[in-house]
A protein has these predicted regions:
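Long, structured stretches of catalytic cores involved in phosphate-ester chemistry, encompassing
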Residues: 23-83, 87-624
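Bacterial N-terminal signal peptides that target proteins for export
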Residues: 1-11, 377
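Bacterial N-terminal signal peptides
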Residues: 9-19
Length: 624
């Protein structure tokens, strides 16, 4: 006998497919939390029809006595929307639920606001108002049985069993929240699901039909795991984009002349990623990608779009130009049959010149005459501060040159693109934080040169996803970070293993995960690195202090060793004057950060690394 909730879901899906129009608009996905702060929190939800919702919230699950502003859900964003709660009290536990105009309600969720400097300040012992906080980070949420630990996503159950959701102030999902599935979901099925007429289909969906498969991918993953849904309802999360959010093993998004289906799906993928996840992220550039229809002529290097005004575009806030592969299947990972591009002019282009409002000069002549779907990408990276720390959330996929694994030190190739790299270096230099976190979806010191025992998906370039094939960028960043006199932590994902690596006395790499994906095998996939000890891959030696490790003789589907990491930033300790008195926060002379790695199946503590802030002036009395 089917579980009642499964039966209801099946009947509801059937009702959608039959084109039902009598169901009221309701909440289909969410709520999820993001954009946390000491006096603010944002709430995301998706509705069955485009419309509105609001949030009721308060200090108890039965005392939701405050009401948010109205959020709008929009059809061209798959009926997703976000509302921000403001004027909240620091370090306070709240409860909330999403409500639609017809009274449809979500389950009750809960969150805790961040502390504030005023909340923690003590004029004598903590004049800066520092406070402690924790976050969880990992990568790799793959739920597909053929390449993961399966649908239940046991790590999230462990996180709840260990009450991690109640302890952490936020989480970082460091890439690969999504894995490709249902990417062939057709526009016609989406129309029925949305209960709209053909005339109501947004122009964006007509122009980029593969987006409906991407949206369905997100909804499928959300539907599949109650543990995952519960986590996002309780823990505000930041995200990096990695290859599976676009297409597995995506390279060369910034290399003019590169013609491959994977990179030119970038802008459609980033749009869906922001619709469902990265709405939560801080953004240095708020300008969205531009999607248009271009007239292209054979042998001519001009692009014409009579709906655009290129003279008014904020070019410093935008990325390069892609002519799309086209068609419904542009975003699938492994099509059952080879698929031909719907557009002979597809590829990566550089904009050389704005000729006039409707005309761009590109880096090369077009091979054929066509009317083509194209986009000019967005820049999806940013930073945020909390206490005495600053986080820089990178995009290692959207502005990435096509690497040269035989010449990894080439100065003309970049993993971030020059603009993002300059932003990062300037941000590190000008930051007033004591601890700096660089959040990179791909690994820093360990190569990613294998596919976990699977088959490489790109046959026109040798695989390496990591910074190890962009050594000029990596060494420049390490030297710059090491010169700052602060502790700098590079948080990484992508490789399905966890490790702690000391690069210099002040620069470290910590990789965490996977939450649910099959582990890679270091001898096959990671440059034959050791489980711990000295390691050299490229010009710079490092020390692997600890790692997870899957021996190559373990069958692929038996490599199920999920991990997660809790990071504790410790700035103060509590010293009330008397037992039961109010908190009195006293600042440590040298604050410290603890990286604690746990087994995702059992919650067993595997490893701890504690790192103190840079040396301070010696205190104490001389001994005669």
């Amino acid at each position: 006998m089917k579980h009642p909730s499964s039966l209801f879901s099946a009947l509801l899906t059937l009702f959608f497919l039959l084109g039902a129009t009598s169901l009221p608009a309701g909440i289909t996905h969410g709520p999820a939390l993001g954009r946390p702060g000491s006096d603010t929190m944002s709430v995301w939800a998706r509705t069955s029809e485009s419309g509105t919702f609001h949030v009721t919230y308060g200090l108890g699950p039965q005392a939701l006595d405050q009401t948010s502003e109205i959020a709008q859900t929009q059809l061209d964003h798959d009926n997703t929307g976000v509302v921000t709660l403001q004027g909240l009290t620091p370090a306070m536990r709240y409860y909330y639920r999403v409500v639609t105009p017809d009274g449809h309600q979500s389950e009750v969720g809960t969150f805790r606001t961040w502390p504030s400097a005023e909340w923690a300040r003590n004029a004598e012992y903590n004049p800066k108002g520092l406070f402690n906080y924790k976050f969880e980070f990992a990568c790799g949420n793959n739920p597909k049985p053929e390449s993961s630990a399966g649908h239940p996503m046991a790590t999230y159950q462990t996180l709840f069993d260990r009450k991690v959701a109640d302890e952490v102030d936020f989480a970082i999902l460091n890439g690969d929240w999504l894995y490709e599935e249902k990417r062939d979901y057709p526009v016609e099925s989406w129309i029925r699901q949305m209960r709209i007429d053909d005339a109501d289909v947004p122009g964006f969906v007509r122009q980029c039909p593969s987006v409906t498969g991407l949206w369905e991918n997100y909804k499928t993953f959300w539907d599949r795991s109650p543990n995952l849904r519960d986590w996002h309802r309780r823990v505000p999360t930041f995200y990096t984009i990695d290859d599976h959010e676009i297409i597995n093993d995506v390279f060369g998004t910034n290399t003019p002349g590169y013609r491959n289906r994977r990179p030119v799906f970038r802008d459609i993928a980033v749009r869906g990623w922001i619709d469902y996840l990265a709405w939560s992220n801080p953004q240095r550039h708020e300008v969205p990608a531009y999607f248009g229809k271009a007239r292209l002529r054979a042998g001519i290097d001009l692009l014409e779009d009579f709906e655009a005004d290129f003279t008014k575009m904020p070019w410093k806030d935008m990325a390069n130009l892609h002519v799309h592969w086209g068609g419904q299947l542009a975003g699938v990972m492994d099509p059952e049959q080879p698929i031909e591009s719907a557009d002979p002019n597809f590829g990566v282009y550089r904009i050389e010149e704005v000729i006039d409002a409707n005309t761009l000069r590109l880096d090369r002549p077009l091979p054929t005459t066509s009317v083509s779907s194209y986009s000019i990408g967005r820049r999806a990276y940013g930073s945020f501060e909390i206490a005495n720390t600053e986080f820089f959330i990178l995009d290692t996929r959207s502005h990435r040159d096509l690497h040269d694994i035989d010449n990894p030190s080439r100065e003309d190739l970049s993993i971030l693109g020059r603009q993002q790299m300059d932003w990062l270096l300037d941000g590190l230099t000008n930051s007033e934080a004591e601890f700096l976190f660089i959040v990179s979806s791909v690994n820093f010191m360990v190569p990613h040169i294998g596919s976990g025992g699977g088959v490489d998906k790109v046959d026109d370039i040798k695989k390496d996803d990591a910074w190890t094939v962009f050594l000029h960028d990596r060494e420049k960043l390490i030297e710059h970070a090491d010169s700052l006199g602060k502790q700098v932590f590079v948080l990484t994902g992508d490789l399905h293993n966890s490790f702690a690596i000391k690069i210099t006395d002040r620069v470290w790499e910590f990789a965490s995960g996977p939450h649910n994906s099959i582990n890679h095998s270091p001898p096959l996939d990671e440059g034959n690195r050791p489980a711990n000890g000295p390691f050299l891959y490229g010009p710079r030696p490092c020390e692997i202090k600890w790692s997870t490790y899957a021996m190559p003789d373990i069958p692929r589907l038996s490599r199920r060793f999920p991990q997660y990491c809790i990071v504790s930033v410790n700035n103060v300790f509590n010293q009330p004057r008397n037992l039961g008195a109010e908190n009195r926060w006293v600042a440590w002379e040298r604050p410290y950060v603890m990286f604690q790695f746990y087994n995702g199946l059992t919650g067993e503590l595997n490893y701890v690394e504690t790192i103190h802030a840079a040396e301070q002036v010696m205190k104490g009395l001389p001994v005669e």
